[in-house]
Amino acid sequence: MTSRRQFRRSVLFAGALALAAFSTSPARADRCDDVAKQLATQIDGVKVNFKARNIVYLTHPATKEFSIGCRGQNYSLELFAKTDRKYKPEFLALVANAGALVFTIPKPDVVTGSTRCMKRMGILRGDKVSMRFRRLNMECTRTKTEASIAVTRGKDE
């Protein structure tokens, strides 16, 4: 009789553990998804395209590529945008709006930093410019046909 009770008790205990392990927990949205949805609702023309691993790809008429990266090896958030070599003011406005929302800093700071980075590319400084402005790392790159900007914030900030 004692062995039967011990067996029943152990089976009930194992069943309770299995139920606790496989019970459904509420789905938690990633911060990256939240930021992408916020961008889509607050900036005209931005649409969430798809998510691949830790990158959310977005679309906008002023860009060729537009994405938000979350939790890389050296950064906590990344905003990447690519356009034609001769970028338009709408492109810088989009980067400024998105940067202000993603990194929660004032929009004029992002406008100043991204404009400086894009304007520094040229004969004197080359086609790849890296700079730091208001705790944001900005890297501007251009090729013969495209110009891009990657704005990141380090993990420790």
Language model features with spans:
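Bacterial N-terminal signal peptides that target proteins for export
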Residues: 2-14
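Bacterial N-terminal signal peptides
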Residues: 13-21
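Sec/Tat signal peptide C-region and signal peptidase I cleavage site
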Residues: 24-29
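N-terminal secretory signal peptides
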Residues: 30-74
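Extracellular/mature segments of secreted proteins
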Residues: 38-43, 76-81, 124-127, 147-151
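Short Gly/Thr-rich strand-loop-strand
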Residues: 46-57, 107-137
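Long, charged/polar, surface-exposed segments that mediate recognition or autoinhibition
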Residues: 70-121
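Short, exposed beta-strand-loop hairpins at the edges of beta-sheets
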Residues: 128-155
